[in-house]
Amino acid sequence: MLISQRPTLSEDVLAENRSQFVIEPLEPGFGYTLGNSLRRTLLSSIPGAAVTSIRIDGVLHEFTTVPGVKEDVTDIILNLKGLVVSSEEDEPVTMYLRKQGPGEVTAGDIVPPAGVTVHNPDMHIATLNDKGKLEVELVVERGRGYVPAVQNKASGAEIGRIPVDSIYSPVLKVTYKVEATRVEQRTDFDKLILDVETKNSITPRDALASAGKTLVELFGLARELNVEAEGIEIGPSPAEADQAAHFALPIDDLDLTVRSYNCLKREGVHTVGELVARTESDLLDIRNFGQKSIDEVKIKLHQLGLSLKDSPASFDPSEVAGYDVATGTWNSDAGYDLEDNQDYAETEQL
């Protein structure tokens, strides 16, 4: 099996909805292969939501006007195409807009149901005079890519229901370039630089993750033809290699107190990997293993970038009573003294 160095992916946030991603090092030629695949998927296959049809009170078709409204119906529809929405519902949902003049009608006047969010409330829709009144019913659906109005026209639709073009894609622009990068003595490896700009309904990071998931699913079809087929295996990341090394460490290397060490040994926990597979509840079930021992273990694991199975990622050693983070020692009022192991003699006698 050929093993390739694992590439790294970094993100540089350029603006609120624009990021530049760098993937390197890639085997020669894979920069264009990956870049083109990601770009096409980002532009065409990221799920989103859009308005598919509208119904305006007193209007039968789009080639007309609304009394008291400056814009005609065609202009209103064009403005609504710019509406940025997201929906958590798989089925079509309905939103309502009701506004009495005079004044400007914006997307912020739309009342969305639960699970639907309007992300550009300042978007202009229409302008009303003193006698103007606008009531609009909007249907929002989830989809991908672009769907023309003719495909949104449902057979048997009620009179006055106007289908509109739907732009589901939440990605506005994607560009990429490939540069040469050095790996040891070789200078022909690829560095892929991907620039992604999105609407407010999704972040560039989430859009790229969605594209990656789609491609993995599709390429998986080819892999299933023969799961034993030989290919280029991506090596472990530095973090994964460090973690594997830490898992193999004996608990002797954690420099635990006598009580904690003996309790774990008696329970059959010999390596760090076996320790992190336990929960706090598991450890508390061990005889003579109390909360102070739990705190000690959590601190030692935190120093390695690890944690117990159910420990929160937000664990902060400085919040443990009696522990001095600056010196890495316990204060005398912590309940035991690391310099005096007499507290743990009972464990030795068990």
Swiss-Prot record:
Gene Ontology cellular component list: cytoplasm; DNA-directed RNA polymerase complex
Q: Which Gene3D superfamilies match?
A: 5' to 3' exonuclease, C-terminal subdomain, DNA-directed RNA polymerase, insert domain, RNA polymerase, RBP11-like subunit
- Gene Ontology biological-process entries: DNA-templated transcription
Keywords carried by this UniProt record: DNA-directed RNA polymerase, Nucleotidyltransferase, Transcription, Transferase
Give me the reactions it catalyses: RNA(n) + a ribonucleoside 5'-triphosphate = RNA(n+1) + diphosphate
Q: Sorted alphabetically, which Pfam families does this protein's record hold?
A: RNA_pol_A_bac (PF01000), RNA_pol_A_CTD (PF03118), RNA_pol_L (PF01193)
* GO molecular-function terms, A-Z: DNA binding; DNA-directed RNA polymerase activity; protein dimerization activity
Q: Where is this region: Alpha C-terminal domain (alpha-CTD)?
A: 241-350
Domain of life, source organism: Bacteria
Residue ranges, annotated region (Disordered)? 328-350
Give the span(s) annotated as Alpha N-terminal domain (alpha-NTD). 1-226
Q: Entry's CDD domains? A: RNAP_alpha_NTD
Give the EC number(s) listed in the UniProt record: 2.7.7.6
Question: Does RNA-binding show up as a keyword for this record?
Answer: no
Acidic residues compositional bias: what residue ranges? 336-350
Fill in the domain comment.
The N-terminal domain is essential for RNAP assembly and basal transcription, whereas the C-terminal domain is involved in interaction with transcriptional regulators and with upstream promoter elements.
- State the family it belongs to: Belongs to the RNA polymerase alpha chain family.
Its biological function? DNA-dependent RNA polymerase catalyzes the transcription of DNA into RNA using the four ribonucleoside triphosphates as substrates.
Partners and quaternary state?
Answer: Homodimer. The RNAP catalytic core consists of 2 alpha, 1 beta, 1 beta' and 1 omega subunit. When a sigma factor is associated with the core the holoenzyme is formed, which can initiate transcription.
Q: What is this protein called?
A: DNA-directed RNA polymerase subunit alpha
